[in-house]
Amino acid sequence: ALNSDEKVVLQKLVQSFRQSEKLQQHVEFLYAKGSVYHIENGNLLYHGAVPMTKKGTFAVERFEGHAYSGRALMDYCDERARRGYFAPEGSAARQSGQDFLWYLWCGKLSPLYGRSAMTTFERLYVEDASTHTEVKDPYYTWYNEEAVCRRILAEFGLPGTSHIVNGHVPVQELSLIHI
């Protein structure tokens, strides 16, 4: 539970977000032009990952009593995010969609996140490095395999000659040796 000072801070943050005209314009632009994935000129574009199992198959996530994987999961995530923005103000559908944005931000099988946990707080405030672990989705083990790429393309109705444009590939720190 929040104390009274924390409640005031949270209320001010919410008010600032809701009343920011510039932020609302950006959000409207993202919903008007963006999506969880996009197909253009035979190319498949997405930001995060197509959640996978350790065996390289599409991971299955369950929502509202239904199982989703691959393209169906991405379509469902896109629809739920839009529900959170476009459903009538104060409706259960809008609240549910807004709550779903949290899952998209840091959910284990979120196609926008691609990690097992969000440990930003732990990295900032906890010295014990064992609390900082964010295991990457198996997608990042498989995404350079031709057969997996062809399977992803087929899942989205594209031929094996198409391209995948992956907008969020974790950057690895390289140790350079100077001679």
Regions found by a protein language model. Name each.
Residues 1-178:
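Feature recognizes metal-dependent phosphohydrolase scaffolds
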